[in-house]
């Protein structure tokens, strides 16, 4: 039988012997070590490489190798395409070769620039199961631990670009390396060949979380791997090989699959337009860390984004009813809840990537349609009819219909009093009564003191709400300006699973 010494001494070792890297990107590098345990130096006569197209091996390939000394080797995937099955066999003249094997699948690079005349889109999809009780109470469960993401681009191709791109799409299979063009950044100054660091003029959160980037200028591009980032400085795993001016753009890259179906329109014999959707690989998601700096009320975030008033805000009133319709004769109608549920259709315009990223962070915090938050209504709640001089829990308002507060769950239980000095005061309404002079008296949970009508800009209702759907589709006019349209559903009942003890004092 073999002993440890029989195996260990007078032997040659490779660490590791093989690597299954899965999906890789151009420029990826893999390392291994070779050493031997012979008592005298060993002569390496050569290295035989198979499957080496576009692959470079760096390290000692011949000569005398000292005993018990580790020799480092690096395999660089520079120009490989498709499946990679690379073997490096080390020949020591003993009649048997010692081999290192690398298996991988190279993602196809899609560096072609998109046509911004059709705005590119980035869609983030969560998945929430909503179970609704008879009275409208909801139980919501997030079914994905990570959202899925897709991007949609239009490519306009002319002349030789046309048939090259068409042939590329028609013959490609497997994964692709897709730039997130709307999230591009710019260099603060040019880059020279051999530079191991690049400096950016600005950085998006998605680029900061990337492992691979594309540097593109006109029809030239280079794929670089990120070792680390410190502010606006990016350290590369290996120096770049080309020169780029300050006008070059830096784009985060993601591994994705093209959708099952894409379309092309031939406007001329030499002019095609391709519309393609790419689904990012959900197992290789690289997303920015969530930044939670949102103000809270009753342990729930307050929705901080203002809708674009240049676009109409639509409000839909949904009444929860059970209707028995015999088709002949009278119908039987039963109201499941008191009042209607409002669904607000709002469009939000972002004028910087930082603003849009904050909205994305809020959606992630809510886990799509699962979480609850407070949102301002599009109109006013009511108006004060007189000043508040001394501390009181009651104040008078103009006739508003809030006297139905006890009979309906639809009226907002919280309000935000916005003052001209920029301050916002939150109040919780307990009830409202009618006065003989036509005004109404509102009783609040919090005391109010020294509040003049002339100091109040507006009083808006704060509805408990959630996103009505799990899809967040951002449309980019430029890399800075983007919009999203969302329906936001009012909730009549708070989720008791959310601990209200964490509420801030108002």
Region spans (language model):
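Extracellular/virion structural assembly segments
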Residues: 1, 97-232, 236-506
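Short strand-edge motifs at loop-to-beta-strand transitions and within beta-strands
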Residues: 30, 69-73, 440
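Short, solvent-exposed loop/linker segments at beta-strand-coil boundaries, enriched for Pro/Gly
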Residues: 48-65
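Beta-sheet-dominated interaction scaffolds and their linkers
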Residues: 2-38, 76-80
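Serine/threonine-enriched low-complexity regions used as flexible
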Residues: 84-92, 178
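Beta-strand-rich extracellular modules
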Residues: 76, 89-95, 447
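Short acidic/proline- and small/hydrophobic-mixed sequence motifs that coincide with surface turns
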Residues: 39-44
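Short, hydrophobic beta-strand segments
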Residues: 67-81, 86
